[in-house]
Amino acid sequence: MNFYSAYQHGFVRVAACTHHTTIGDPAANAASVLDMARACHDDGAALAVFPELTLSGYSIEDVLLQDSLLDAVEDALLDLVTESADLLPVLVVGAPLRHRHRIYNTAVVIHRGAVLGVVPKSYLPTYREFYERRQMAPGDGERGTIRIGGADVAFGTDLLFAASDLPGFVLHVEICEDMFVPMPPSAEAALAGATVLANLSGSPITIGRAEDRRLLARSASARCLAAYVYAAAGEGESTTDLAWDGQTMIWENGALLAESERFPKGVRRSVADVDTELLRSERLRMGTFDDNRRHHRELTESFRRIDFALDPPAGDIGLLREVERFPFVPADPQRLQQDCYEAYNIQVSGLEQRLRALDYPKVVIGVSGGLDSTHALIVATHAMDREGRPRSDILAFALPGFATGEHTKNNAIKLARALGVTFSEIDIGDTARLMLHTIGHPYSVGEKVYDVTFENVQAGLRTDYLFRIANQRGGIVLGTGDLSELALGWSTYGVGDQMSHYNVNAGVPKTLIQHLIRWVISAGEFGEKVGEVLQSVLDTEITPELIPTGEEELQSSEAKVGPFALQDFSLFQVLRYGFRPSKIAFLAWHAWNDAERGNWPPGFPKSERPSYSLAEIRHWLQIFVQRFYSFSQFKRSALPNGPKVSHGGALSPRGDWRAPSDMSARIWLDQIDREVPKG
């Protein structure tokens, strides 16, 4: 296995092409197709999709009934088949072909010097500017063979073209109007196993039609859990009564991977790498997809499968798709604003319902001046405001221990006072010393032993105090630990920060919490004074503050469990898709190896934009795998209630992640050893 090969990780490079049409000149059009096919070959593309009636042109109307044109189409088609024998891509080319007593609007599927099959257009429009049935026959229900170049090849709308050496690549083809009907052929094909859906389109442009196409293609890719490759006719088509924009686009499960400039001068291609393993994973998890297949089994089981050997390149061809560094945090500013609005209000509404159900208890929260407790506090404040409850019913406690820094403690105090909540400070130092002495810990006799017991005595006492205060004052303990910490087991179990009465942060990863706080600042919800404190919190190193300063420069969470940016990246791929470690490493390398490439979320400081080598990615992935699969599940199995927030998933044992607490991570670690280079 070549780790750097996209094809080895289930990607398929596809191209949606629009060329310069020479109407009524099939030889010229075939030559244009061949030029673009060679360019796609050089790009390492496995598929090249061309517009409807590629070889004749779409806009030639009754000329389609002329024998000379049809003869020239067949000759040009055979030349194209022969000339493309040494090319990698599967070519999907439009052609009017004679069959029985009619002409059919077809897509001819060509690979390595052979015609794999011919797909007729199912639905021919005869409304508004369209009059296709005047010249051609509808292909819905057609199943059989057609004679091309002296050979019988498969003909019908029931064809799936499957790469025998790339199991995730199964192609189905439909033509233009087929996408616009309520039950398109591609939907049946997806249920039958197609992962890549191609559409050859004529589709003249009018105001608003491009957006209609985008909506339909996006919807098809999302509903079918598939890729949708769309290519429309452009320059060179007749403008006697119509115009053409040459729109090409590639969608994958509702996400736009590539789109070309419309109204191009000359040829254009949209090229992207489709993740067939992602599509397979989504279908595997969404059981109703296969339930739908069973319901339509008479249709789906009648599809014919045509196998071919793709023989894709084994080397590094790069990766032609955006891999988000922060899959929980979109880089698009508008989408990030929307996500932050939704995440924040999911948390707030979740807490509101719990408070209503308990007849409005006080909210008891430990505040440290760190990200998580800061965000939980502002969520609680907003919930109280919405419910018309006094902010003084929030009881915020600073619980300094042996290593609490003045900066973080001051941030906690300033924030609590600026918000107008009830604030108190309880120094746990004396109680912690007593406990350490009682259990005979070396620290109690002056030894500088800062082990896990030393840390957990402090973490446990903080939680113990909060629960007893909640008992005393009629409150509930609000948890602050986030999704990233739950994934890594970076919490103290039981009587510790793992436990609470309700946790608003349980579904929010660390990387998103930072942006939620930025969003709250920019929204100005709590005023300028609160915003200044929140910014100070954002500027502070993430630390548990459990080991005394001076022994280490600063106790860093990320030095122990890894950069949260990388670990959140791995968590998303594992939780949402169940990807292998080798694929996660491949994606992480493309996302993180160059800080100058790709997009960063808005507001992300330039001075804090890291890059990671493959060796670093591999090391922290090993840490993630060990902690996630083997070490930390017992903490998640006893997780308090809290709302799911992200589409990436949550870790509640009652929801997205149900796993045994006593499992080994060996198979994942072995796969890293075998398949991820050491850098």
Swiss-Prot record:
Gene3D superfamilies: Carbon-nitrogen hydrolase, Glutamine-dependent NAD+ synthetase, C-terminal domain, HUPs. Keywords: ATP-binding, Ligase, NAD, Nucleotide-binding. Residues 639-658 are annotated as: Disordered. In the C-terminal section; belongs to the NAD synthetase family. Catalyzes the ATP-dependent amidation of deamido-NAD to form NAD. Uses L-glutamine as a nitrogen source. In vitro, can also use ammonia with comparable specific activity. Homooctamer; composed of two stacked homotetramers that form a ring-like structure. This is Glutamine-dependent NAD(+) synthetase.
